[in-house]
Design a protein with these regions (language model features):
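N-terminal leader/auxiliary helical segments
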Residues: 1-93, 97-258
Length: 258
């Protein structure tokens, strides 16, 4: 999972070039599209201090190929076509497109021992924000859904119920709010408290000293990001055709989320 900002940024950029009908649907159900941009990552935030069956769904679905994930979802949506589901579908496609391109490199860099997976993604998020000239990005507001919308999302993930989606999003939004606090004593206290329960969130809250360690990794990741953007229009076309008349998904959907 490139981190939250990278996925939000990528999806927002890709939305402008999507076919007009897809763009209208995404804008009409923008909350679902925005949450779709985070893909299965939301389950990592379900009661993260302990291992749970729901929390493990994040890893389970990241091990699926694009063909597995999107074929199953499209079969489901054809049985009960709903525009809300399509909005989430295309958000999730954005998530997959970026994950599938970036994760192999992130795993390689992590194995080389410079920094771990989460640290690399955290530093890359900050790099992108600096590239965009942003110092104060509020993403928690994009992580809220109504109860019926949680029901839409749960259809994408066998084993999850609407209540699980709701609690996962609440956890994700709370973590984001903590990470969005300005540098100072309050942020230090809150992030240290979060880090007590999870190494992952401790890495997400790492200070700017991490940026220097990961600086040399950002450019190769940015190249993967740009390649994902270049390949995305073809993925949109293929997914639309697959949903509409079960056209086969190509090799672009062979990689796993990672």
């Amino acid at each position: 999972m490139p981190a939250t900002y990278a996925h939000y940024r990528f999806g927002t950029q890709m939305l402008t070039g999507m076919p007009a009908d897809v763009r209208r649907t995404a804008k009409r159900y923008r909350r679902l599209f925005d949450v779709g941009l985070q893909g299965p990552d939301l389950f990592f935030y379900y009661r993260p201090v302990v291992s749970t069956k729901i929390g493990r769904l994040g890893s389970k679905f990241h091990r699926q190929t694009g063909k597995e994930f999107f074929s199953r979802i499209c079969r489901n949506l054809r049985l009960e076509p709903r525009e809300e589901g399509l909005a989430y579908l295309y958000g999730a496609l954005c998530h997959y497109a970026l994950d599938a391109k970036c994760h192999p490199l992130i795993e390689k860099l992590s194995r080389e021992g410079i920094a771990n997976h989460i640290q690399i993604e955290t530093a890359f998020d900050r790099f992108l924000m600096e590239l965009d000239g942003k110092t104060d990005v509020r993403l928690a507001k994009h992580l809220t859904l109504t109860d019926p919308e949680c029901g839409v999302v749960s259809r994408f993930y066998p084993g999850a119920e609407p209540k699980h989606v709701r609690e996962s999003l609440k956890g994700m939004a709370n973590i984001r709010r903590a990470l969005e606090l300005p540098e100072g004593p309050m942020r230090t206290m809150v992030t240290k408290t979060i880090g007590l329960g999870s190494r992952t969130f401790r890495d997400m809250a790492a200070g700017k000293e991490l940026d220097a360690v990961c600086r040399e990794l950002n450019q190769p990741l940015l190249e993967r990001y740009r390649q994902a953007a270049k390949d995305f229009p073809e993925q949109v076309i293929q997914l639309g055709a697959h949903f509409a008349y079960n056209a086969p998904l190509g090799e672009e959907f062979t990689p796993i989320f990672g």
